[in-house]
């Protein structure tokens, strides 16, 4: 006969192992995004009348580099139509959702990392200034940090 205390200890050990596995798995998911990412393309659909679609690929006038760090900070810098820009902020992931907050400007998007490519899907609701948009951005990992 197995003593009840041994059952409790075994059950507790199993629960601790499952908890540890869950924590490590969550950290592993976040680590997919850690690294340096270079902009490749953006395709946007503008729900105007008529609907418009535009695509832009990386060139000397359209560049961006995102750097995600393990401590939850990120930075970006780039060039858009000859104008340089840069900022820093905080990032977090929850399942397939990436949240970036740079100076109070929050971007929430779906993300997927497949090999050395990261895809960000951004949905923006219509406002007084802008039409509703759906954008897909692709970035390539510059330095594999996994």
Show the residue positions of the predicted features.
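Bacterial Sec-dependent N-terminal signal peptides
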Residues: 1-31
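Lipid interaction determinants
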Residues: 24-88, 92-146
């Amino acid at each position: 006969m197995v003593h009840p205390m041994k059952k409790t200890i075994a059950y507790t050990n199993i629960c601790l192992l499952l908890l540890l596995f869950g924590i490590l798995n969550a950290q592993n998911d976040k680590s997919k995004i850690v690294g340096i990412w270079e902009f490749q393309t953006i395709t946007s659909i503008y729900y105007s009348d008529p609907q418009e679609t535009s695509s832009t690929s990386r060139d000397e006038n359209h560049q961006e580099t995102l750097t995600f760090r393990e401590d939850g900070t990120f930075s970006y810098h780039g060039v858009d139509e000859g104008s340089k820009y840069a900022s820093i902020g905080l990032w977090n992931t929850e399942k397939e959702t990436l949240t970036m907050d740079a100076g109070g400007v929050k971007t929430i998007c779906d993300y997927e990392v497949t090999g050395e490519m990261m895809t960000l899907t951004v949905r923006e609701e219509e406002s007084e200034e802008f039409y509703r948009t759906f954008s897909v951005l692709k970035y390539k990992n510059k330095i594999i940090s996994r």
